[in-house]
Amino acid sequence: MMVLKVEELVTGKKNGNGEAGEFLPEDFRDGEYEAAVTLEKQEDLKTLLAHPVTLGEQQWKSEKQREAELKKKKLEQRSKLENLEDLEIIIQLKKRKKYRKTKVPVVKEPEPEIITEPVDVPTFLKAALENKLPVVEKFLSDKNNPDVCDEYKRTALHRACLEGHLAIVEKLMEAGAQIEFRDMLESTAIHWASRGGNLDVLKLLLNKGAKISARDKLLSTALHVAVRTGHYECAEHLIACEADLNAKDREGDTPLHDAVRLNRYKMIRLLIMYGADLNIKNCAGKTPMDLVLHWQNGTKAIFDSLRENSYKTSRIATF
């Protein structure tokens, strides 16, 4: 069997015995096969130069380029911090973003309380004080008397006026509660409203016909009570409704006497501005001005005493 060398197979050249060339087909004799292979290699080289990277490398470069473009776009979209206006814009954007992320909790409305059992008097009075409207409504719907009271003759209306529970006051008045009902100290609803300081309740009572001149057992008017408790808006409304500025209580004190004694500066200014008399004397023969001087003298005496004691202490310390 004839053995061919690789060189003879590729080049088509004969070996020394002149036998190899006879094996090759006629078309590939005289080096034509070598020329064909060389031409094919040259074509492969051109393709390699035109496409120097593989397909995987092309995809990797494409992804990198896309990421770079996205990053550049994001940077361009960002606000440049060049002045205070830019800073303000950034802050507002941050706030909006935070607001969008914050979920608003859904607040469920409490289910209306349904009272099926009968309501007794103590529970009814307590409900008026604690603003439990369903309990009050149940008591009234059972045709009970709205003017029932405790041992001090204080009604549900008195209690609701003190605490400023407007809805309960309205419900009681619709049921026929007496506005002028007096407790053990002869205070009416208007006294209790002035003591509690709720202007809306006070306005409702006056609109429903409550007597602005009503006096309690100490002969105090609603204006006296509002001044003593420091409820400025209530006092101002009572004055606007023509309450008596110079009404005297059992001690002969006017609202101005009370304001001076309690050192309520805003009340003093309010009463004087609307024309309160500075020269009215109480049962002790003192005018509001006398009380001011008495207060000033008393304060001066206290400071003089403190200064004298301080002086004596310092002299003792020197010996």
Swiss-Prot record:
One of its GO terms (cellular component) is fibrillar center. Interacts with YBX1. Interacts with TTN/titin. It comes from Homo sapiens. Induction: By TNF, IL1A/interleukin-1 alpha and parthenolide. The keyword Nucleus applies. Keywords: ANK repeat, Coiled coil, Nucleus, Repeat. This is Ankyrin repeat domain-containing protein 1. May play an important role in endothelial cell activation. May act as a nuclear transcription factor that negatively regulates the expression of cardiac genes. Induction seems to be correlated with apoptotic cell death in hepatoma cells. One of its GO terms (biological process) is cellular response to tumor necrosis factor. ANK repeats lie at residues 152-181, 185-214, 218-247, 251-280, 284-315. GO terms for molecular function: DNA binding; histone deacetylase binding; p53 binding; R-SMAD binding; RNA polymerase II-specific DNA-binding transcription factor binding; titin binding; transcription coactivator activity; transcription corepressor activity. Its main location: nucleus. Mainly expressed in activated vascular endothelial cells. To a lower extent, also expressed in hepatoma cells. It comes from the Eukaryota. Residues 61-89 form a coiled coil. It is found in: Nucleus. The keyword Flavoprotein does not apply.
